[in-house]
């Protein structure tokens, strides 16, 4: 059974978009994935996103995706929400991935906006609702036009929110004004998908965040959202400002590269990256050490 959720926080408040650990020869490291998932939940995560962008989903097979979700559910599914990334730019393929994720025990689905083919808003609506219809799991949309090439407009979000299983949105649009209107009008549970904007989005109505830096600072993120919910705005701001070097450092290059580099520095499961992604250079690793130390991360 998944942890308790509410309509306001269907996936909890603090989630980390987990990397996919690989062995030295590039194979899926299921044991490492289970150990990393347990570490992240022990640190304070309410949920984990599996097979997202940070999970190198473009380079894993459908079978690997299912195996990874199954392994993480076995490891932490009784105490954390396991949300499977199943979004592609092919609606039928996404439906197949959604059904597979449901079969292996996922608690929810993350659906990224179709990328490259740039469908119109009606196409986005049909795509998302078809997937939500095909599986019996709650859905978190993922609006990231910088990668997908097309935004989910507010009117479309309002329509999508009428679907009983579309309950949340991960916002990586970087537009607080649009977010403010969309939160107010759609009623969707709003999750920040941009670590630098975690606190600003909480201020305009977000309920939590899907984080990359949660791999290294989950306790601090937990403390920040708890302070905000308790009305201690000053404490939340102090934590946000303390973490600024981490937010900056973890995104000097692609987030999965710095995340796996940071995990390696901490002796946690990560492994190499699959092409076309590559590991950090020695110079990038040294800069990452400086950034993490400036944010109080112990290595």
UniProtKB/Swiss-Prot annotation:
In terms of one coarse class, where is the protein primarily found?
Answer: cytoplasm
- UniProt GO MF annotations: 4-hydroxy-tetrahydrodipicolinate synthase activity
| Enzyme class name | lyase
**Annotated residues for binding of pyruvate:** 54, 210
This protein's UniProt keywords: Amino-acid biosynthesis, Cytoplasm, Diaminopimelate biosynthesis, Lyase, Lysine biosynthesis, Schiff base
Q: Where is this site: Part of a proton relay during catalysis?
A: 53, 116
What CDD domains does its record include?
Answer: DHDPS
SMART domains xref list: DHDPS (SM01130)
Q: Which GO terms describe its cellular component?
A: cytosol
Q: Which reaction does it catalyse?
A: L-aspartate 4-semialdehyde + pyruvate = (2S,4S)-4-hydroxy-2,3,4,5-tetrahydrodipicolinate + H2O + H(+)
- Please describe the quaternary structure of this protein: Homotetramer; dimer of dimers.
HAMAP family registered for this protein in UniProt: DapA
Q: Which family does it belong to?
A: Belongs to the DapA family.
Q: What's the protein called, per UniProt? A: 4-hydroxy-tetrahydrodipicolinate synthase 2
| UniProt source species | Streptomyces coelicolor (strain ATCC BAA-471 / A3(2) / M145)
Give the lineage.
Answer: Bacteria, Bacillati, Actinomycetota, Actinomycetes, Kitasatosporales
